[in-house]
Amino acid sequence: MKWIVIVAGLLSFHRNAQEQSLCYEISHEKLGIERSYLFGTMHAMEENSFFFPKRITKLLEKSDALCLEIKNITEVRIEPEMLYDTTLHLKAYCDSTEWSNLTIWAEEKLFMKPIQFEENFEHAKPFMLFQFILAMNLPANKKSHEQELEKIAASNKIQLLGLESVHEQLNIFNQIPFDDQMDMVFSELNNDEKNIKDFNEMQQAYRKQELNVICEYATNEKLDGNISLFLDDRNKKWIPKMKEMMKEECVFFAVGAGHLCGENGLISLLKKEGFNLKVIKL
C-alpha cells in the first residue's frame, strides 16, 4: 500500500522558495554537528525521466544513517480503521452526477462494476479514494527516490530512520472534514489531464533542480487551505527530531522537496536554529 504516502510528496510543493538546490550539507558548530545532509525528493517519477545523480549515492555512503519521512514504508501494516469508517457513507457526500462520474472512473481505471465499487468504497474515507485517483494519474513505469536510497542503505548496512509513522501521516487527513476531502477527490478526478501535464512539467523542473519552480506549482489548489497540516506543522515537529539525530551521527535526510520551501520549510527552520546550510550541486 505504498501509494498511501505518494500524496505526501506530490502535494508537498509550496511557495516562497529562495534556494536553487535539492541538496544541502548541514552543520552546527556550537552543537558539535560537523556534517549531515538534506535532500529533497520527488516520491514518484517516470522511469525514463528519473533523476538520481551519482553524488547522492556517494553522500549517502558517507553517512551513518538514512532518515526518510517514514522508514520501511512497504513493510508497515495499516489498520483498516485508518482507511475505513463504518459510520460513513461515501455516496451521501456526492450528488447523482458526481457519483456517476466516480463509478465511470472506477470501471475505466479499476475495472470495477458500479456495484463492486460501492461495496469496496462505500465506507472508505475520502482521502483513500483521493489517493487511488492520484496514483492512477501517475506513470505506469515509475521509480522512487526513497526506494533507491533504501537499496543503497541496505547494501551498505546504513541505519534506517524515520521522522514520523504512517499513522501520524494518515492522521493528517483525519483532521480535514469529509466535505473538504471530497473536494480534493473531485478536483483530482475532474482535472486529470491538467494534473498529468503538471506532473510532467514538475518532473522537468526537478531534473533541472529548479526548486523555486517546483515550489511555485499550483498544488496549493489541492492542499485547499491545509498547507499547515501537510507541510508546516510536520516540518516544525521534525526539527527537534532532526537535531537530536544529528547530535548522534551523520544523517542523510531525504524528504519531499516541498518540505524544503518557504518560511516554514526545513531550510528556513534549520537556519533559525543556528544551523549552517551549504548548497551541494548535483
Regions flagged by a language model, labelled:
Residues 1-25:
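Bacterial Sec-dependent N-terminal signal peptides
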Residues 4, 53, 235-239:
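Short, well-ordered alpha-helical scaffold segments within catalytic/effector domains
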Residues 11, 43, 258-259:
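Short, glycine/serine-rich, charged loops/turns that create anion-binding
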Residues 18, 48, 233-237:
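Short secondary-structure boundary/capping elements
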Residues 26-37, 42-223, 229-230:
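Structured, acidic catalytic/metal-binding patches in enzyme active sites
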Residues 228-282:
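A cross-kingdom marker for long, charged
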